[in-house]
Amino acid sequence: MTKEKIIVIVGPTAVGKTALGIALAGAFNGEIISGDSQQVYRHLDIGTAKASAREQALAVHHLIDIREVTESYSAFDFVQDAKRAIEDIVSRGKLPIIVGGTGLYLQSLLEGYHLGGDLDQKELLAYRQQLETLTDTELYQLLASKGIHLDQVNRRRAIRSLELNQFARDLENQEAPYNPLIIGLTDEREVIYERINKRVDLMMASGLLEEARWLFEQYPAVQASRGIGYKELFPYFQGQASLEEATATLKQQTRRFAKRQLTWFRNRMAVRFDSISESSYPQAIYDRVERFLKEP
């Protein structure tokens, strides 16, 4: 069976994924699927770096503004929503382009797991999320306790082995459901950090403080409020930090988040990274996509 070709753009926050996605959508008759756990929420526009109205007018976007802030959203929900969006886009002869930095969501969509028995996929993904909280050392200690030996140290294989061990009768490891071209964007760490600092300043100038205050006053305990971009400003509203201190914390936490994102994609997904500072960018990516789409 022919697998549907999809483009997946990943990388740390503020590296330019949205701009590349829109450019590729225009060049290759594509539509964008957001792969970001926070952009699903309505009213949270600035802190989630959601594509602006102007950007959304340049390319159709899916999985943006599909939940109220009071609702929860999980990897399971994303997989179901993304599959429907891909089917819809392909049915109209267009190219699905997934753009986002929520690694667990993207990995869950691209993995070739098939639930063959009575196991509910929510149970599988809940177990996966539990494993993701473990350090590498804890993960390999768990493998050893179950008598599982891996020849190579690979976190992704370790988690897959534990899932298969846990759900041996209900989980079949089949081929991945899609044929993805995964594009990773990166740059020197200092460059990424400077982009993050500038973007936070721009967000603050664009009304992030008011957006965060609304969330703090109306829904301080919901899942959406735990995302980076909001909770760092809550101490300011509580009188526990100055605005300067809260903004500095937001920048720091966003930089740390970007570092974790890079580590995730390098260790757990087969990502080829392109530096956005290279003279060949983005033409090299256009050429790669063109070759990919021409392949049988």
Curated annotation (Swiss-Prot):
Keyword annotations for this protein? Answer: ATP-binding, Magnesium, Nucleotide-binding, Transferase, tRNA processing
User: From which residue to which does the signal peptide run?
Assistant: none
Give GO BP annotations, semicolon-separated: tRNA modification
Region: Interaction with substrate tRNA, residue numbers: 36-39
Broad EC category: transferase
Q: Which reaction does it catalyse?
A: adenosine(37) in tRNA + dimethylallyl diphosphate = N(6)-dimethylallyladenosine(37) in tRNA + diphosphate
Task: Please tell me where ATP binds in this chain.
Answer: 11-18
- What Gene Ontology terms describe what this protein does at the molecular function level? ATP binding; tRNA dimethylallyltransferase activity
> Which residues of this UniProt protein bind substrate?
13-18
Task: Look up keyword Ligase and say if it applies.
Answer: no
| Interaction with substrate tRNA (site feature) positions | 102, 128
Q: Which SUPFAM superfamilies match?
A: P-loop containing nucleoside triphosphate hydrolases
UniProt cofactor(s): Mg(2+)
Q: What is its EC number?
A: 2.5.1.75
Q: What does this protein do?
A: Catalyzes the transfer of a dimethylallyl group onto the adenine at position 37 in tRNAs that read codons beginning with uridine, leading to the formation of N6-(dimethylallyl)adenosine (i(6)A).
Q: Which family does it belong to?
A: Belongs to the IPP transferase family.
* PANTHER family found in the cross-reference section: TRNA DIMETHYLALLYLTRANSFERASE
Self-association state and partner proteins as the record states:
Monomer.
- What protein name is recorded for this chain? tRNA dimethylallyltransferase
Task: Name the lineage.
Answer: Bacteria, Bacillati, Bacillota, Bacilli, Lactobacillales
